[in-house]
Amino acid sequence: RGESSGSSDRKKSEFVTMCESRVVTAHGIFNSNNTTQGEINMTAYTVRDAKIEDAQRILEIYAYYVENTAITFEYDVPSKEEFKQRMRMTMQKYPYLVIEKEGRVYGYAYAGPFKERAAYDWACELSIYVDHAAKKCGLGKQLYAALTERLKQMGITNLYACIGYPQTEDEYLDKNSEQFHEHLGFQTVGTFHRCGYKFNRWY
């Protein structure tokens, strides 16, 4: 596990990548002027707080990653009721956001505690999932920008995202997540090796 010495006068975000992964530190706020190839006009998309009523659609987005990728290390798609309970637990303290267009949710992101000890109260772990058919369209960047701003307002100074990173890309895991975070200014600060086993292989 990578560690950083967080301080309130130096805003920095860090993310931990698992499975040959890395913990990354981002300095400052994500630059909204950075654009990527294939980025779409975001004016039609809206970021808002998630509602429990969104659970079914959010679970549909997540289920693809559970069943087809090593992006999440979960083996089985949770039930709708279990997923609702996870959402409720997060919403008690942290922001849980969705991005939608014309009433349809295309992605979601949320924060949670990095560790349970009181001294970690200024640190959060981030999670983000975008409809697999709408990846690399700028939705993730817009979600992260909104989530980061909300967490800043809460006084959070350190952000972590634990992501899978393959030494060699395969059909279950590529390096897109690492590249996405690097594009937003994250930097590697730590690595776990062979810490997750899924699809009969180590990550």
What kind of feature is each model-predicted range?
Residues 43-45, 103-108, 203:
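Glycine-rich phosphate/pyrophosphate-binding loop shared by adenosine-nucleotide-utilizing enzymes
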Residues 46-58:
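A short beta-loop-alpha structural element at the N-terminal edge
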Residues 60-77, 90:
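Helix-loop element at the rim of GNAT/NAT acetyltransferase active sites that forms part
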Residues 75-133, 144, 150:
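Acetyl-CoA-dependent GNAT
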Residues 127-136, 163-168:
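A short, internal acetyl-CoA/4′-phosphopantetheine-binding micro-motif in the GNAT/acyltransferase core
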Residues 136-149, 174-179, 183:
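Conserved acetyl-CoA-binding loop-helix of GNAT-fold acetyltransferases
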Residues 151-173:
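Conserved GNAT acetyl-CoA-binding A-motif
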Residues 162-164, 178, 182-201:
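Conserved catalytic-core motifs of GNAT/GCN5-like acyltransferases
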